[in-house]
């Protein structure tokens, strides 16, 4: 038996560029600014404006209270929860809600996947509203220069360019994102600090007393808190990008980013208190800019919005790629536009996001209305992350008191934010909730349907069929089907095989081959695992290969099997030269043919109403995906797909023979005639 474990099969074409940035260095910190903080770094564009539009009376206590809420939200939510706690809950260096779920999947909980798909679906919904609100707000800054400029057409043009360039990758321009975001954050901090000097008393906002006063005495505290929450919406993206930059780089960069953000928020607050009568009609972000810098500020804001949008789009591709390997989402065509590791492009998702962003811009028309749609979905994502972090801390043996304190504190905080954001439901929050709800339904149906499909796959012990497979190979009266016949085996148990696979070899059309290969695909909980183990079941005849693939790795079975075979040939465990004399004499290897057993749901089976509904939706959802050969990265020219029915709860009813009844009737007729 040949058993080669821990065999790395990484493609040589991929460059692990991102991994080099995990080391603490100026370059690593610069890259982190460009990748991680785009979303949270553009929040000053609209947070203070959203607070002013809540209808609360604008006075010192209101502004100090709102700013205090912002400072302590960034501290409690972003710094403590995400930077100090969540970044330590990494899955071999990867972060994000699905990576966290993959760590917990081994707990065998029947419902924990629900938390993961709720969080993932709402995070994806947030990814549609973010490009719309950031780019629109940035372009609205032009109204300070020329009120007649067409904001919507300019915004749509920029959005179109952002999504169009995805197909080419962003490797060339991505290197400059870090430098640009460094300049952006310096602009935020310097302009904010200058504005603070006009109203130094604004520094009292560091005292949480003012936040408590606002939340206990203001009748509009719910609306204000909903607007305040927008300052931390990028925290979840910060956790998701852990694998790109590393925990230490993110932690150090956050200290700089947080300082610049707070300076800018305080500067906006100082300007508002100095211009109370006119503050409601303008965006304080652009108002604190010197008139001579206004055009420069709009250009910088637009650039920062583009960086934030790019990060959200790339993040969406990564999340869905993980969801595919975790069996939360149908397999879709994935492209790699550059050689940078982890940079993906999913054409259908890119188009769907583009249409969604355009519709949101056309529906809400301006950033003030978009603010109502923003924040609700991501609050739910954060709440799901808190629950999963609680399970993670418990699984790691963290003191029960600390785990309960953590979960209790953050569930309470996020439940309050959720309640505050629900007040915006009718004003626009319904939009992202609708998108998130549709995505959740699709993921839930896909997970349940996949479980049903696996449950009704009948398996048989493979060792019972060693002899007959060997006999078929030796039977020259059977036409040779292929030199090497490869099956993808979906049986979960070790040593078992899908009965339809055996039926294909033995019964349907006996298939003679020189070598039979059974491939098992095991998607593991770690992100970048790419290993295989191989067993020789019948020498020179039957082989079983198990491929262990991480949830961030795209399956490419043809490529991986070729590397497995090369290893076997090099170790002289198998002779792959063609058995045809003319080809063998010239050292030509035998051909390969793949057979995929595809089960098609049979509606007439005796499935209950719930199963029938799930499978019907599953069939509909599967149409957005690609077929299994393409999903597995197979060369479709050498693939045969055999379709068999998937029958649930089959109840066979015997057909009754009526020959004797017919004979009796004929006898009676004859007697009547007599």
Task: Pin down the residues of each PLM region.
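The structured alpha-helical core of multi-pass membrane proteins
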Residues: 2-674
């Amino acid at each position: 038996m040949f058993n080669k474990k821990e065999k790395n099969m990484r493609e040589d074409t991929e460059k692990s560029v991102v991994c080099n940035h995990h080391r603490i260095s100026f370059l690593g910190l610069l890259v982190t600014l460009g990748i991680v903080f785009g979303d949270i770094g553009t929040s000053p564009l609209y947070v203070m404006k959203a607070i002013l539009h809540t209808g609360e009376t604008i006075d010192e206590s209101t502004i100090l209270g709102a700013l205090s809420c912002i400072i302590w939200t960034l501290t409690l939510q972003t710094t403590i929860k995400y930077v100090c706690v969540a970044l330590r809950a990494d899955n071999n260096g990867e972060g994000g809600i699905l990576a966290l779920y993959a760590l917990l999947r081994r707990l065998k909980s029947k419902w924990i996947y629900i938390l993961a798909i709720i969080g993932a679906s709402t995070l994806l919904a947030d990814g549609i509203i973010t490009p719309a609100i950031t780019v629109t707000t940035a372009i609205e800054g032009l109204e300070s220069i020329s009120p007649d400029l067409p904001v919507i057409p300019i915004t749509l043009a920029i959005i179109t360019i952002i999504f169009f360039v995805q197909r080419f990758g962003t490797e060339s321009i991505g290197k400059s994102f870090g430098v640009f975001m460094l300049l952006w954050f310096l602009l935020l901090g310097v302009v904010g600090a200058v504005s603070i000097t006009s109203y130094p008393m604004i520094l009292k906002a560091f005292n949480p007393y003012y936040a408590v006063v606002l939340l206990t005495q203001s009748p509009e505290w719910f609306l204000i808190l909903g607007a305040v929450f927008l300052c931390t919406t990028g925290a979840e993206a910060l956790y998701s990008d852990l694998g790109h930059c590393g925990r230490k780089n993110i932690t150090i960069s956050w200290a700089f980013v947080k300082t610049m953000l707070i300076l800018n928020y305080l500067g906006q607050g100082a300007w508002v208190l100095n211009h109370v009568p006119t503050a409601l009609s303008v965006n304080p972000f652009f108002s604190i800019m010197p008139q001579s810098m206004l055009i420069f500020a709009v250009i910088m804001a637009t650039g920062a919005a583009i960086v934030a949008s790019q990060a959200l789009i790339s993040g969406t591709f990564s999340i869905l790629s993980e969801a595919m390997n975790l069996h939360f989402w149908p397999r879709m065509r994935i492209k790699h536009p550059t050689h940078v590791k982890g940079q993906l492009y999913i054409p259908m998702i890119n188009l769907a996001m583009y249409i969604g962003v355009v519709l949101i811009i056309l529906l809400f028309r301006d950033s003030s209305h978009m603010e109502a749609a923003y924040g609700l979905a991501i609050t739910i994502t954060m709440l799901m992350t808190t629950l999963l972090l609680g399970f993670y801390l418990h699984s790691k043996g963290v003191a029960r008191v600390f785990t309960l304190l953590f979960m209790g504190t953050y569930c309470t905080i996020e439940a309050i934010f959720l309640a505050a954001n629900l007040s915006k439901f009718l004003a626009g929050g319904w939009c992202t909730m609708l998108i998130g709800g549709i995505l959740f339904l699709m993921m839930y149906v896909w997970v349940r349907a996949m479980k049903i499909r696996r449950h009704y796959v009948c398996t048989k012990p493979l060792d019972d069929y060693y002899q007959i497979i060997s006999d078929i190979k030796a039977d020259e009266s059977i036409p040779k089907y292929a030199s090497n016949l490869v099956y993808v085996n979906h049986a979960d148990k070790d040593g078992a095989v899908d009965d339809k696979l055996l039926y294909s070899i033995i019964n349907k059309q006996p298939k003679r081959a020189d070598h039979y290969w059974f491939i098992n695909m095991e998607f593991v909980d770690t992100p970048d695992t790419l290993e295989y183990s191989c067993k020789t079941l019948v020498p020179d005849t039957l082989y079983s290969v198990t491929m262990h693939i991480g949830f961030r790795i795209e399956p490419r079975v043809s490529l991986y099997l070729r590397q497995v075979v090369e290893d076997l040939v090099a170790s002289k465990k198998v002779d792959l030269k063609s058995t045809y004399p003319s080809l063998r004499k010239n050292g030509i290897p035998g051909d390969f043919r793949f057979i995929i057993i595809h089960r098609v749901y049979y509606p007439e089976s005796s499935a209950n109403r719930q199963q029938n509904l799930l499978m019907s939706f599953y069939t509909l959802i599967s149409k957005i995906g690609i077929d299994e050969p393409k999903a597995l990265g197979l060369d479709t020219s050498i693939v045969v797909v055999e379709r068999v029915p998937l029958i649930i709860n089959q109840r066979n009813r015997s057909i009754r023979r009526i020959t004797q009844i017919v004979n009796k009737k004929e006898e009676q007729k004859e007697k009547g005639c007599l």
